[in-house]
Design a protein with these regions (language model features):
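Bacterial carbohydrate/catabolite-sensing allosteric modules
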Residues: 1-61, 69-140
């Protein structure tokens, strides 16, 4: 039987810089360590195709804000990487660490780096204006 590259669904928004950067990194990894076959549907956070349950892939990399979408991905029982998703919100009986991981940014480290930079410039009065319901923003 001929080699079949892994099939990986990329459920990542393509309309924002962060999503495009993630896609660029995944593509680079695939070039170095692959090849992988990708399933990518351009769009925003709620972009999983309705037939996702019937897709027979080998893994998923997802940035979703939708609880139902996250649970659907877990029900597929394939390795899943969640980007900045609060996995604490997932039902314990569905979430299994051996096949699911949550990749988050170091928000505290980013905040410290920004503060140190501003302090190094002699600024002592500054503030952060973030997004109220974004996990990464709240931590900063």
């Amino acid at each position: 039987m001929a080699f079949q590259p892994p099939r990986v669904a990329l459920l990542i928004e393509t309309s924002r810089s962060y999503g495009r950067s993630v896609l660029h990194g995944v593509a680079r990894y695939s070039r170095l360590h692959g090849p992988w076959n990708f399933l990518l549907t351009p769009g925003d956070f709620a972009q999983a195709p309705p037939q996702m349950r019937d897709w027979h892939g080998d893994g998923v990399i997802a940035r979703t804000l939708d609880q139902q979408m996250a649970e659907t991905l877990l029900e597929m029982e394939i390795p899943t990487v969640f980007l900045d998703y609060p996995v604490d919100n997932l039902p314990r009986q569905k979430y299994r660490k051996e096949r699911c991981v949550d990749l988050t940014s170091d928000s505290v480290g980013a905040a410290q780096m920004a503060a140190n930079y501003l302090l190094g410039k002699g600024l002592t009065r500054f503030a952060y204006a973030g997004y109220p319901f974004q996990r990464w923003s709240i931590s900063r």
